[in-house]
UniProtKB/Swiss-Prot annotation:
Binding, Mg(2+): 61, 174, 330
Positions of disulphide bridges: 140-202, 486-493
Keyword field contains Lipoprotein: yes
Organism the protein comes from: Homo sapiens
One Gene Ontology term from the biological process aspect of the record: dephosphorylation
Name of protein: Intestinal-type alkaline phosphatase
Residues the entry annotates as binding Zn(2+) 1: 61, 111, 376-377
Subunit-level organization: Homodimer.
Length: 528
């Protein structure tokens, strides 16, 4: 077709939508020029051969490569683009590797043992956290002596401030890998443990959160695991199912507050914003739900902070330490959306995850901050069907299947989306497939969709980011971070000192007036 734009009708049957593809893409010069610019940038790329003052690890739980691509399309289309051509924030990182995610005892992994790998540098057994593979799942007596130490813990010992941010409960498998040692990832509180394990001296994960190490910032969900059984929840006081569940009668939040003179505990967005601006706050714990935080599509923006806002609040506090910081940020509910077989939930979580990466990049400098983005594992999630460019990622394939019914581009290999009534697969239309709660069809019936076993990507930017290359064991991630900051066992790293930045010039400091303005607006809206 000729003209300034090539118009494509994207969709057949009743699923018409209009996509606009630039006519210049028909000209080879467009692609040659684009490639030449990318090649020129690659030739100019120089490794930053200095010590990393700061370390940030962004973990997209379940963010396999197919999910990254689908997220790119969704985020691009949300911004009025066709989709696949629009880079994510993580796409702009200059270095890339693949990570092998298997556990010592499983070919397809879980989030506990993978956390041990990328956070502690040692591969482990399925459903265990912070322990070598000599430990056995659910056997309390195999814990002692098999503990492995996270890079975050080593950063704290080196004098850095440290923080954990997640959209799951803070006691969940991925964040727990920064501080806990347990043979069962589900031992969130003592109420979740068998009496025999408690008698043998094993500790629940919530107890380890406040006792194993001094964590400066803790933001996520998980209130009920911190309070005695029957303690009403501040957000849902009339709902007994949201009450505290601890059997030992301990108030772990109060115990944590008592340890630090400048500690604050918050449970909503307004309190978080206030605490993050208060220079007297040295430690900050924010628990915004009894369990996991709400999905982004269900989040109340006046009450619940987004992952991007939690990340910014953490950076504001941690960046005050002149010796630097370590921050772990997890987009944890990407994984949950996939397990439920609801791609809309998973991908909108992933878009917010990328927004948090983008904001962190604005608030830090790649000259002194090593930032890695990776996943713990993938999912049996795929999209295909020869869909036309610009069509909704949640839409239908342009042709019907052999049973003369439509099918969605996104499908799951297994999960709760399996529906076969009297030997007949249900039909689907564009309106159904675009619904936020639509469960994509699956090939095998399971109550919960499973992880995938393929390699995942590792994106890197900052000092020593060039070490992220090739195909590596997942445990390599932790070693790159430890080496970059000259932490154990790489204290003799012989790297040049980190780049110097002044408080006045620091991007986080520059953002304070904007945040103060946000608080004023919040106060005004709350006024009678």
């Amino acid at each position: 077709m000729q003209g300034p734009w090539v118009l494509l009708l994207l969709g057949l049957r009743l699923q018409l939508s209009l996509g606009v593809i630039p006519a210049e893409e028909e000209n080879p010069a467009f692609w040659n020029r684009q490639a030449a610019e990318a090649l020129d940038a690659a030739k100019k790329l120089q490794p930053i051969q200095k010590v990393a003052k700061n370390l940030i690890l962004f973990l997209g739980d379940g963010l396999g490569v197919p999910t990254v691509t689908a997220t790119r399309i969704l985020k691009g289309q949300k911004n009025g683009k066709l989709g696949p051509e629009t880079p994510l924030a993580m796409d702009r990182f200059p270095y890339l590797a693949l990570s092998k995610t298997y556990n010592v005892d499983r070919q397809v992994p879980d989030s506990a043992a993978t956390a041990t790998a990328y956070l502690c540098g040692v591969k482990a057994n399925f459903q265990t956290i912070g322990l070598s593979a000599a430990a056995r799942f659910n056997q309390c007596n195999t814990t002692r002596g098999n503990e492995v130490i996270s890079v975050m813990n080593r950063a704290k010992q080196a004098g850095k401030s440290v923080g954990v941010v997640t959209t799951t409960r803070v006691q969940h498998a991925s964040p727990a890998g920064t501080y806990a040692h347990t043979v069962n990832r589900n031992w969130y509180s003592d109420a979740d443990m068998p009496a025999s394990a408690r008698q043998e001296g094993c500790q629940d994960i919530a107890t380890q959160l406040i006792s194993n190490m001094d964590i400066d910032v803790i933001l996520g969900g998980g209130r009920k695991y911190m309070f005695p059984m029957g303690t009403p929840d501040p957000e849902y006081p009339a709902d007994a199912s949201q009450n505290g569940i601890r059997l030992d009668g301990k108030n772990l939040v109060q115990e944590w507050l008592a340890k630090h003179q400048g500690a604050w505990y918050v449970w909503n967005r307004t309190e978080l914003m206030q605490a993050s601006l208060d220079q007297s706050v040295t430690h900050l714990m924010g628990l915004f739900e009894p369990g996991d935080t709400k999905y982004e599509i269900h989040r109340d923006p006046t009450l619940d902070p987004s992952l991007m806002e939690m990340t910014e609040a953490a950076l504001r506090l941690l960046s005050r330490n002149p010796r630097g910081f370590y921050l772990f940020v997890e987009g944890g509910r990407i994984d949950h959306g996939h397990h439920e077989g609801v791609a809309y939930q998973a991908l909108t979580e992933a878009v917010m995850f990328d927004d948090a990466i983008e904001r962190a990049g604005q608030l830090t400098s790649e000259e002194d901050t090593l930032t890695l983005v990776t996943a713990d594992h993938s999912h049996v999630f795929s999209f295909g069907g020869y869909t036309l460019r610009g069509s909704s990622i949640f839409g239908l394939a342009p042709s019907k299947a052999q049973d003369s019914k439509a099918y969605t581009s996104i499908l799951y290999g297994n999960g709760p989306g399996y529906v076969f009534n009297s030997g007949v697969r249900p039909d689907v239309n564009e309106s159904e497939s675009g619904s936020p709660d639509y469960q994509q069809q699956a090939a095998v019936p399971l109550s919960s969709e499973t992880h995938g076993g393929e390699d995942v990507a590792v994106f890197a930017r900052g000092p020593q980011a060039h070490l992220v290359h090739g195909v590596q064991e997942q445990s390599f991630v932790a070693h790159v971070m430890a080496f970059a900051a000259c932490l154990e066992p790489y204290t003799a790293c012989d790297l040049a000192p980190p780049a110097c930045t002044t408080d006045a010039a620091h991007p986080v400091a520059a953002s304070l007036p904007l945040l103060a303005g946000t608080l004023l607006l919040l106060g005004a809206s709350a006024a009678p």
